[in-house]
């Protein structure tokens, strides 16, 4: 909806900001609440 959100790592570390442009999936780029994903953390502009 907003084009961004947060991912909660399973190791209990701090939530990670994610922008829809970082989602690598064919078609509409969306994630559902509770959906399990794999991710790599990269430093970007704020």
Swiss-Prot record:
Gene it is expressed from: cspA
Transmembrane feature ranges: none
GO cellular component, one term: cytosol
Domain of life: Bacteria
Alphabetized UniProt keyword annotations: Activator, Cytoplasm, DNA-binding, Stress response, Transcription, Transcription regulation
Annotated CSD domain residues: 1-46
Annotated InterPro entries: Cold_shock_CspA, CSD, CSD_CS, CSP_DNA-bd, NA-bd_OB-fold
Induction (UniProt): In response to low temperature.
Organism in which the protein naturally occurs: Aeromonas hydrophila
Localization: Cytoplasm
Cited Pfam families: CSD (PF00313)
Subunit structure: Homodimer.
Molecular function via GO: DNA binding
Primary location: cytoplasm
Record's protein name: Major cold-shock protein
SMART domains in the record: CSP
Coiled coil: none
């Amino acid at each position: 909806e907003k084009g961004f959100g947060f991912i909660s790592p399973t190791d209990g570390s701090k939530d990670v900001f994610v922008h829809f442009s970082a989602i690598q999936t064919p078609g509409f780029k969306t994630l559902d609440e509770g959906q399990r994903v794999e991710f790599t953390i990269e430093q970007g502009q704020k």
